[in-house]
Amino acid sequence: MVEKEEAGGGISEEEAAQYDRQIRLWGLEAQKRLRASQVLLVGMKGLGAEIAKNLILAGVKGLTMLDHEQVSPEDPGAQFLIRTGSVGRNRAEASLERAQNLNPMVDVKVDTENIEKKPESFFTQFDAVCLTCCSRDVIVKVDQICHKNSIKFFTGDVFGYHGYTFANLGEHEFVEEKTKVAKVSQGVEDGPDTKRAKLDSSETTMVKKKVVFCSVKEALEVDWSSDKAKAALKRTTPDYFLLQVLLKFRTDKGRDPSSDTFGEDSELLLQIRNDVLDALGVNPDLLPEDFVRYCFSEMAPVCAVVGGILAQEIVKALSQRDPPHNNFFFFDGMKGNGIVECLGPN
């Protein structure tokens, strides 16, 4: 009997059983790429927990959870990896036990140092880096490091009912499965002289493609003054501008909007909205004032959706299967829908 490890080219019998459904879904080669991938996940709040869960279950080789913050009283509301009574512990350390139990085959590690103190050499051990809960300056800096070292970069956050993801994969090559269309002439059903296209779901072909991404800095600094940009502005989701406002709030206050200081934070958010959108050269009314009612705290259902999307994009990028989101994904929990936006210099 041939061992599955030999037949699978590096996938053991135990792994073949564990990842059987995924191997059937996206193929053995894609799963082997996942099993060889190291991922850094920064920020272990509610969104980070969802991303960690999905990546661990997908079967990456290793996941490093980095967070220098302590568990707050409100964290367990959306962070299911943290046990009750963990307030005051480091968030990453408090998440380790449950995270590792999800899949013992994945090497789950913890890092409690501030991401801002990490040298460039730290990031080169990873195939993909995903940031949550980070300032705009950190996001831009790490994205530049990842681009320089050909590391796949992702970032995302959840603010109340709203969430976003962003990816910079540089020049990314992937394969997409396409169903063959067979030309059938003289179809009996349609008459002897009729030609029709018949979709044969049993025949598929793998098509290689390439897509080029821009940096997060370029995506956040779109020049809206050109005629082309003004035309695109009408189709751009307000959530893009909401993200700009919330990242500026995080930079100015060193935290996200808090329900404990709702009145004060709401006033500041409106002022930041006016300043940020004026600086971008767009009308502040593009982001209606009632946005302040829906962007406080992390909501578990929104974390689940955005975390699922972000983890899926990481898996797709590492496995080089299927078209990636280029480059933003915005989720509006009030409307219950999401949209992919490609924003940048072009």
Swiss-Prot record:
Modified residues (N-acetylvaline): V2
Keywords: Acetylation, Ligase, Nucleus, Phosphoprotein, Ubl conjugation pathway
Single Gene Ontology BP annotation: protein sumoylation
Modification N6-acetyllysine occurs at: K198
Disulfide bond annotation, renumbered to this chain: none
Any Pfam family hit: ThiF
Keyword Ligase assigned: yes
Superkingdom of the organism of origin: Eukaryota
Molecular function, one GO term: SUMO activating enzyme activity
Annotated compartments: Nucleus
Family statement: Belongs to the ubiquitin-activating E1 family.
Subunit structure comment from the entry: Heterodimer of SAE1 and UBA2/SAE2. The heterodimer corresponds to the two domains that are encoded on a single polypeptide chain in ubiquitin-activating enzyme E1. Interacts with UBE2I.
Listed name of the protein: SUMO-activating enzyme subunit 1
Organism: Bos taurus
Name of encoding gene: SAE1
